[in-house]
């Protein structure tokens, strides 16, 4: 399971010209599900995302996690993160989870974060989305479990 996280001062997702999810300070999470992923991996990754210290403390050091910084999450499903780009000029998605598996783990990821008290907005699974963000830093990390 893969989470590409970006520290943002704001981010939003638009589907059919309507904003369906938006946050101010927080993390934009692009979430990719691979075939071997399961609930245990999902919980481990969600915990890591919420606990990862990417926000600056009073000394300007990346020392605060999402909750400590008072941030929110915007979680967007992104199957292309599971692409194999090692050969040729066209990505292969054979390692990506099935749509049913990915939807279940995506929904579980969001529910798990909300259950921890984190304000969590979402995109729309499987939709053609327009994602807008102001990357703060920029600060971007590729987390995998």
From Swiss-Prot:
A motif (Gly-cisPro motif, important for rejection of L-amino acids) lies at residues 137-138. It catalyses: glycyl-tRNA(Ala) + H2O = tRNA(Ala) + glycine + H(+); a D-aminoacyl-tRNA + H2O = a tRNA + a D-alpha-amino acid + H(+). It is an enzyme of class 3 (hydrolase). Pfam families: Tyr_Deacylase. GO terms for molecular function: D-tyrosyl-tRNA(Tyr) deacylase activity; Gly-tRNA(Ala) deacylase activity; Ser(Gly)-tRNA(Ala) hydrolase activity; tRNA binding. Its main location: cytoplasm. CDD domains: Dtyr_deacylase. Signal peptide: none annotated. It is found in: Cytoplasm. GO terms for biological process: D-amino acid catabolic process. SUPFAM superfamilies: DTD-like (SSF69500). Its EC number is 3.1.1.96. Keywords: Cytoplasm, Hydrolase, RNA-binding, tRNA-binding. One of its GO terms (cellular component) is cytoplasm. Belongs to the DTD family. An aminoacyl-tRNA editing enzyme that deacylates mischarged D-aminoacyl-tRNAs. Also deacylates mischarged glycyl-tRNA(Ala), protecting cells against glycine mischarging by AlaRS. Acts via tRNA-based rather than protein-based catalysis; rejects L-amino acids rather than detecting D-amino acids in the active site. By recycling D-aminoacyl-tRNA to D-amino acids and free tRNA molecules, this enzyme counteracts the toxicity associated with the formation of D-aminoacyl-tRNA entities in vivo and helps enforce protein L-homochirality. A Gly-cisPro motif from one monomer fits into the active site of the other monomer to allow specific chiral rejection of L-amino acids. PANTHER family: D-AMINOACYL-TRNA DEACYLASE 1, D-TYROSYL-TRNA TYR DEACYLASE. Homodimer. This is D-aminoacyl-tRNA deacylase. It comes from Shewanella sp. (strain ANA-3).
